[in-house]
Amino acid sequence: MSSNSFAYNEQSGGGEAAELGQEATSTISPSGAFGLFSSDWKKNEDLKQMLESNKDSAKLDAMKRIVGMIAKGKNASELFPAVVKNVASKNIEIKKLVYVYLVRYAEEQQDLALLSISTFQRALKDPNQLIRASALRVLSSIRVPIIVPVMMLAIKEASADLSPYVRKNAAHAIQKLYSLDPEQKEMLIEVIEKLLKDKSTLVAGSVVMAFEEVCPDRIDLIHRNYRKLCNLLVDVEEWGQVVIIHMLTRYARTQFVSPWREDGGLEDNEKNFYESEEEEEEKEKSSRKKSYAMDPDHRLLIRNTKPLLQSRNAAVVMAVAQLYWHISPKSEAGVISKSLVRLLRSNREVQYIVLQNIATMSIERKGMFEPYLKSFYVRSTDPTMIKTLKLEILTNLANEANISTLLREFQTYVRSQDKQFAAATIQTIGRCATSISEVTDTCLNGLVCLLSNRDEIVVAESVVVIKKLLQMQPAQHGEIIRHMAKLLDSITVPVARASILWLIGENCERVPKIAPDVLRKMAKSFTSEDDLVKLQILNLAAKLYLTNSKQTKLLTQYILNLGKYDQNYDIRDRTRFIRQLIVPNEKSGALSKYAKKIFLAPKPAPLLESPFKDRDRFQLGTLSHTLNIKASGYLELSNWPEVAPDPSVRNVEVIESAKEWTPLGKTKKEKPMKKFYSESEEEEDEDEDEDEEEEEKEDEDENPSDSSSDSESGSGSESGDTGTEDSSEDSSSGQDSETGSQAEAERQKVAKRNSKTKRKSDSENREKKNENSKASESSSEESSSMEDSSSESESESGSDSEPAPRNVAPAKERKPQQERHPPSKDVFLLDLDDFNPVSTPVALPTPALSPSLIADLEGLNLSTSSSVINVSTPVFVPTKTHELLHRMHGKGLAAHYCFPRQPCIFSDKMVSVQITLTNTSDRKIENIHIGGKGLPVGMQMHAFHPIDSLEPKGSVTVSVGIDFCDSTQTASFQLCTKDDCFNVTLQPPVGELLSPVAMSEKDFKKEQGTLTGMNETSATLIAAPQNFTPSMILQKVVNVANLGAVPSSQDNVHRFAARTVHSGSLMLVTVELKEGSTAQLIINTEKTVIGSVLLRELKPVLSQG
């Protein structure tokens, strides 16, 4: 509710008050003239009158004004008696606002709130869920020990409420009750255990928060709910996600073994490069013993939290980042760096927390943030706290490669008007000089130049840093010490003056003429110096007395006498100590003999370390990490267990709603090819296949025209796995759409009777398909050229499998023992047929887009784990090529690449890329191969075999496989010849990271329903109506992305589906035509980044004419 509406309500409320006669006069009284400076005893009197009115409209306006006052921060506690009377109002709007008020003031007005406790208890049974929840909130806000039993009973009832909103408030009330009476812990744990089993995303975050507050050590409550929480995480509210992620981070550190063992082993191998054979053998044995396999539940948590790195909530991104930092393998933690850098565009408070965490991470793993070095450059608008943190990160990321760039950047910072920032920059330069020995002299010379700066603070800080640097190489910088001695007359900052005196004292033997003169000047100004400087004057006098007593003996005695009567007791104490140590007398002991060794002992150079070095002991993103001190309520991360606890504790019993899918699960277990055709199965098949053949004959007699449709649908089942129920269901669904309802019912009964029976129906469908394919070939000769080409492609796809069904048909009737061989041959041929696009690439785009071919291609699918979503052949293969290496840069060698949209023969997770190499020079090019690979983390590449030679004007095409990890990152590698190596980059279009799938409209809608919220992106398209024809939409979509067409029962909705090549995540694209010349483009996918990129590419293509 905005402030404007509140103002309006106040005006309207005043108007109603005038109608009710509460305004005595319109004139301003003398006391009212001073209302700003004195409290009026009739304050809010009009609101009280309105609340006691008989009109609901007056009460409602009064409550709106009161809630408005609360929102503005005004005190409305004196209205509590008038408001609480309306808690039993029959008007639902008034009742809601009353509860909002009571939640705010129930704790302050406990006695009055207790008078209405019976009303609150009745409200817990109210049919409106908001009232039930509000009543529970008010009860838990009273905070009186006497009503603890009432609250406990209310929480138990609310935890079983049908409304998830009420159950959410029950979880909130648990924390309040626990803080009021910790003795209720055991009973509250029972409620928490019950709510943890809740499937609602609305409840998950709140109950985990209650768990963290009440019983964070009861990890056993999380075991059975672990996987559910991981899967619900994406759909939970943002602040609930933060709580759940932090809890699961602690859980993972107690239940899984460390994933860093493997990384540590690799680092050891890198350190010990030259080793003996015995050491290598020992390491091989130890590596076998320490082989690490990540727990599937551990991987589930890491995988399900990764999409949340794209969250708009900075706290969620930070929570995921700390989870990856603390529990993921080191090789995978790099994915968080980009998301954290993105948060630096937020407000300064968010920047401060994020930069603190990056500073801690950059100490251990510099490589994570080196690519984003420029993101940490200081801006003029940054506050000082942000500037110093960015300096800290830049210092941590400094190395030999980038130090020259950073020093130029620091040189600019030193001139800043912000003196605190300039001083911090000088400290940073000193740290870089100590950590990188190659630039120590350069930094020292630069700091010496700063000694002539006009700003005294800059000079003083430079002196302090130079003092620390000179401790590292004291014998080489006598000139610098002399120069600093001259600055004593101009520098007034105590720390700088003390540092110069300390340096001269340490190096008094190297500057024998300057040191006594400096002591003489300091003796003159001793009484006016700062205490810190006085202490260093005493030290300088003692060191000169021990090394050059002839010149400085009287000066030293004079200074010691001044120190003896100084006002500061530390200086008086130091004076007495030094006098007894350096001036021998009768009472002085043997210690004075070693005075020179004591004062002039070599001091170790100071270590300039990062202030964030020790913060890694705290969990990232916590208050303790920010303050660098253990805060109240902080829960420490436990160490990784040596042996993982039993993972079976996370197993959950099968829920009843999943029982109908049990047969599918059983058939999937029988899928392996080795035990596909056993003798026992053949015997069972003989009995049931006879029944199946009779049913098929009856269907043919009733519907003789169905054979053609059966053959078409059967083509889809041929490309699937014939030993599973999945493919049989696909084929039967294609037949049932053509036959009558009787045939459909009969087929479903047969399917339920035994999944093996359906295998036989598949073979019969294949037999019918072979007979009809001949008819389709003869009819295709008489059709147009477009239909001719499409029918040829159909006949080619079916011709490979023709011999197998011909051998199967007689085997069914008389020779069951021979069934073993033809089906296995059929499956093997189908497996080979999966790669048809390799040998027969589509050259003409127009016939490839014909509707008849698309309808046939919908049935073709590869055998996958899903029974309804299978990979299909591409609808269209673009012929566009991209330049990889220009002939001028390649010294005559030119390279172009394209994406053939075919399965990669090297790996299922790789994208196939065809590279055409051409020799445009007049000489032979020898030994063409792929050299070094600069691939991002996780990306893999399978190179082509080296080409011995390429004749002039010759050309050759090779295939490589690249696993892009479902990202559009460029793959950088070297294309080498015998004499040269050329750096090339290959960036895939997002549409080529997909493989098309075939699925029904029902399955499409089902999967789309699960991919909503953050997994859905949409855009509105505007174009001429002629651009929204089905053929145009199909052509444009498949030209941009490798998507499969999904049949649609609606003319104005076009659907396309694919899977990402690497992870197999579904990519669902919907183009819904609206009225006029607009359309809605919707993309549903777990890969939100790829989905948004694909949306940006499809939108202009579909919008243009």
Swiss-Prot record:
Its main location: membrane. Residues 1-26, 271-292, 668-824 are annotated as: Disordered. It is found in: Cytoplasmic vesicle, Clathrin-coated vesicle membrane; Golgi apparatus. Residues 705-722, 730-741, 775-788 have a biased composition (Low complexity). It is a peripheral membrane protein. One of its GO terms (biological process) is mRNA transcription by RNA polymerase II. Residues 750-759 have a biased composition (Basic residues). The modification Phosphoserine is found at residues 276, 610, 761, 763. Ubiquitously expressed. GO terms for cellular component: AP-3 adaptor complex; axon cytoplasm; clathrin adaptor complex; clathrin-coated vesicle membrane; early endosome; microvesicle; mitochondrion; trans-Golgi network. Residues 760-774, 811-824 have a biased composition (Basic and acidic residues). Belongs to the adaptor complexes large subunit family. Subunit of non-clathrin- and clathrin-associated adaptor protein complex 3 (AP-3) that plays a role in protein sorting in the late-Golgi/trans-Golgi network (TGN) and/or endosomes. The AP complexes mediate both the recruitment of clathrin to membranes and the recognition of sorting signals within the cytosolic tails of transmembrane cargo molecules. AP-3 appears to be involved in the sorting of a subset of transmembrane proteins targeted to lysosomes and lysosome-related organelles. Adaptor protein complex 3 (AP-3) is a heterotetramer composed of two large adaptins (delta-type subunit AP3D1 and beta-type subunit AP3B1 or AP3B2), a medium adaptin (mu-type subunit AP3M1 or AP3M2) and a small adaptin (sigma-type subunit APS1 or AP3S2). AP-3 associates with the BLOC-1 complex. Interacts with KIF3A; interaction is direct; interaction is impaired by pyrophosphorylation of AP3B1. This is AP-3 complex subunit beta-1. It comes from Mus musculus. The gene is Ap3b1.
